[in-house]
From Swiss-Prot:
The keyword Transmembrane applies. ADP:ATP antiporter that mediates import of ADP into the mitochondrial matrix for ATP synthesis, and export of ATP out to fuel the cell. Cycles between the cytoplasmic-open state (c-state) and the matrix-open state (m-state): operates by the alternating access mechanism with a single substrate-binding site intermittently exposed to either the cytosolic (c-state) or matrix (m-state) side of the inner mitochondrial membrane. GO terms for biological process: mitochondrial ADP transmembrane transport; mitochondrial ATP transmembrane transport. It comes from Zea mays. A motif (Nucleotide carrier signature motif) lies at residues 317-322. It is a multi-pass membrane protein. SUPFAM superfamilies: Mitochondrial carrier. It holds the Pfam family Mito_carr. Monomer. This is ADP,ATP carrier protein 2, mitochondrial. InterPro entries: ADT_euk_type, Mit_carrier, Mitochondrial_sb/sol_carrier, Mt_carrier_dom_sf.
Length: 387
């Protein structure tokens, strides 16, 4: 039972789960925005807890709050205080946890992706008319494709956990040491710039290796039965996505949208820390300074604010992914952004954001329940899946 003190609480996980976006896997998925207590800090620095999203794990900032940042898969070995055997147990149990949470949240995740990318599907003739909302998307998907289709693309999302976690441990601390600036020693702006640089470099390094899985997951999830052509699907599975994309577009097809994804990492981090450092000194004063729930609420609001503000980047990158294999493609991420704004309006950039919040809540609930089951059956908590 002593090991339980080293594991994040339900509130830590719930706080992080509200983060908008992905994984870029995401993933997502190890985002902790609640107040941090010292027993957790080392564990949080080396493990992801949230499901899926582009930008993710956490780091400790002033005020004692562990805030979600980019998945920073930084160069290093497994934690020194844990033996190789215990590390592997935690790693595998984390994989089980990731599989459980991602699978539970998969239906709402697919609905989010369908709503987000529906305009590209309409262009290619794979969707007859726009979805009217989350409920309508659920209803039509089940009616046209069956209940089990809500989990389409989930396999790639679950598989992505393992290389992402391996990269987290392989990359640990390398970029941290490279940009080792302290706020109190080097000044705020130098620390802020170093934070963005290290997070961006680490995030891009990790993303480079797992991006094709996120691409495949996106294509499978958006592979609704064609409105024209007798209800045929475009892809027959994960391997088929790779095979057809490589045949039509080459390696570039698997990495369409990668550059804007890296930009998204930096934008999210910049928004988060900029908002946090600006709002915290104003809001968390007096009796609220050390208040757990006030800190939790602030972290939740800032996480959602930064996530919502950076959500258009996620939309642009996924819309670019959807053009691989198509005759007409966006010339660049800027071209995609301009065309979407011109033809569909700014609202289109935020399609699926509501479903994304629901997905995060669902994933948090499952992770919390899974931890309790581990205590019940094993007497302790092992790793929790994220990324």
């Amino acid at each position: 039972m002593a090991d339980q003190a080293n594991q994040p609480t339900v509130l830590h996980k719930l706080g992080g789960q509200f983060h908008l976006s992905s994984s870029f896997s995401e993933g997502v998925r190890a985002r902790n925005i609640c107040p941090s207590f010292s027993p957790y800090e080392r564990r949080f620095a080396t493990r992801n807890y949230m499901t899926q999203s582009l930008w993710g794990p956490s780091m400790s900032v002033s005020g004692g709050i562990n805030v979600p940042v980019m998945p920073t898969p930084l160069f290093a070995n497994a934690p020194a205080e844990k033996g190789g055997k215990n590390f592997m147990i935690d790693f595998m149990m984390g994989g089980v946890s990731a599989a459980v949470s991602k699978t539970a949240a998969a239906p709402i995740e697919r609905v989010k992706l369908l709503i987000q990318n529906q305009d590209e599907m309409i262009k290619s003739g794979r969707l007859s008319e726009p979805y009217k909302g989350i409920a309508d998307c659920f209803k039509r998907t089940i009616k046209d494709e069956g209940f089990s289709s809500l989990w389409r693309g989930n396999t790639a999302n679950v598989i992505r956990y393992f290389p992402t976690q391996a990269l987290n441990f392989a990359f640990k601390d390398y970029f941290k040491r490279l940009f080792n600036f302290k706020k109190d020693r080097d000044g705020y702006w130098k620390w802020f710039a170093g934070n963005l640089a290290s997070g961006g470099a680490a995030g891009a390094s990790s993303l480079f290796f797992v991006y094709s899985l996120d691409y495949a997951r996106t294509r499978l999830a958006n592979d609704a039965k064609a409105a024209k052509g007798g209800g045929d699907r475009q892809f027959n599975g994960l391997v088929d996505v790779y095979r057809k994309t490589l045949k039509s577009d080459g390696i570039a097809g698997l990495y369409r949208g990668f550059n804007i994804s890296c930009v998204g990492i930096i934008v999210y981090r910049g928004l988060y820390f900029g908002l946090y450092d600006s709002i915290k000194p104003v809001v968390l004063t007096g009796s609220l300074q050390d208040n757990f729930f006030a800190s939790f609420a602030l972290g939740w609001l800032i996480t959602n604010g930064a996530g919502l503000a950076s959500y258009p980047i996620d939309t642009v990158r996924r819309r670019m992914m959807m053009t691989s294999g198509e005759a007409v493609k966006y010339k660049s991420s800027l071209d995609a952004f301009q065309q979407i704004l011109k033809k569909e309006g700014p609202k289109s950039l935020f399609k699926g954001a509501g479903a994304n919040i629901l997905r995060a809540i669902a994933g948090a609930g499952v992770l919390s329940g899974y931890d309790q089951l581990q205590i019940l059956f094993f007497g302790k908590k092992y790793g929790s899946g994220g990324a």
